[in-house]
């Protein structure tokens, strides 16, 4: 087991006990209940049931010691907690490649009440980037409640910035960071401590989504008409279902669209 010491009986001396970081992020894993669940051409999933999902998650906790799995009021849903987005995303991708089909909720930070005060996980964040992108990154991190601790230019056009930031401020930020820095920035973060929960929402998406109003194949004609509304996720003729997110809206509100409209001949 973790932190157990194997030694000669004549000289028993236990090594220092390892401390396993507590989970800071949780997600709900559940049985895939979409209309395409189990459809081979869509997912290729082999393991679809809650029992199979439970067994796989239970096996994972035997060697992934920082992972925590809990039952919920719904037999088809499990609360899975880990050390961050990357920790859980690796598990999800591994399960997908193994043939497990599942749905997941958006990640949420684990809030604790300590001495009557609501506390949230605070991360130590280090970014290394070209000076020309410094302003944009600092502005976005400021919106996510990050506090600058230190700044060190290297004299060669790059700068290192140290921040303290709520863990929820990092959710979804890595993709945004790569976009701002044109892929040249480096980002590292690690859990530091629990601190007072910051007021207000953090890291809300800037754009709404495009939602299909029906089920069936989405023709190219309909997609051409939708392109002026935002960026699509679809290929011409792709099968979709009612309620499916088919793109990112150019504005900040969600919009239901007709993704099935064909050309009148």
Located regions from the model:
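Accessory interaction regions appended to the cores of large information-processing enzymes
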Residues: 1-265
């Amino acid at each position: 087991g973790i932190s157990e010491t194997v030694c000669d009986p004549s000289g028993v001396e236990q090594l220092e006990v390892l401390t396993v970081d507590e989970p800071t992020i949780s997600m709900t894993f559940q049985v895939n209940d979409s209309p395409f669940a189990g459809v081979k051409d869509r997912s290729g999933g082999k393991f679809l049931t809650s029992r199979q999902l439970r067994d796989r998650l239970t096996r994972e906790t035997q060697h992934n010691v920082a992972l925590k799995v809990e039952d919920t009021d719904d037999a088809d849903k499990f609360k899975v907690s880990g050390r961050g987005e990357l920790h859980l995303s690796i598990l999800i991708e591994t399960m997908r490649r193994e043939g497990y089909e599942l749905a997941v909720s958006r990640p949420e930070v684990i809030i604790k009440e300590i001495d009557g005060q609501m506390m949230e996980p605070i991360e130590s964040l280090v970014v290394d980037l070209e000076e020309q992108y410094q302003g944009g990154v600092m502005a976005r991190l400021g919106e996510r409640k990050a506090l600058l601790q230190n700044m060190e230019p290297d004299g060669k056009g790059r700068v290192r910035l140290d921040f303290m930031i709520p863990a929820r401020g990092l959710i979804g930020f890595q993709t945004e960071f790569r976009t701002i820095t044109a892929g040249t920035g480096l980002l590292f973060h690690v859990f530091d401590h629990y601190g007072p929960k910051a007021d207000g929402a953090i890291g809300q998406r800037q754009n709404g989504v495009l939602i299909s109003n029906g089920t069936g194949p989405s023709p190219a004609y309909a997609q051409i008409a939708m392109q002026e509304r935002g960026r699509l996720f679809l290929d011409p003729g792709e099968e979709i279902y009612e309620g499916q997110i088919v793109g990112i809206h150019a504005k900040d509100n969600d919009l239901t669209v007709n993704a099935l409209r064909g050309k009148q001949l």
